[in-house]
């Protein structure tokens, strides 16, 4: 089985999964978080080198105060658990997105986690928190515009690679496969620059129920695709 080098996942359906079982939405997020821990081990076992997950978008602040507070509590717990997950998998972890909106203790946990894991190289795990692709591109272009103004970058030398170097994902290869769980079929402002030639896989399975068997199925479907990158397959 040809395993994608980089898999990105939109972790969708936690709340709906809980509601269908007559449980609070927060319980769905707890189960989804626990599943993410296991999927990191599964991804490593399958030989995938890069994993990026959409954990909390810039739009998710619009949810109820109770739900957002619950998610922040969950983030605090999960970031601490990530130390063990990182050690077990020799996994480097980076948080992408604008972390300045989070409470200071969460920001500090992020910095500690990134520092702890910086030298691991068997799996690269990006967690998108307070992330939106339009926001990422806007922030990146502001930095590039400032560098142009300062004479560090010449406008006529700007390429796609230059733009990519100003994004949160700089230095990381674009995803080969995007998985979105729970039946929705849209990007929801996730990695819009990076997904230009990515294969998409949509499943009705909610994130808390998305286990290794579903992951393998997604990879098998990926193997059936003919990735032409805009070209034409030679007969």
What is each of the regions a protein language model found here?
Residues 1-235:
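Flexible, compositionally biased loop and terminal segments
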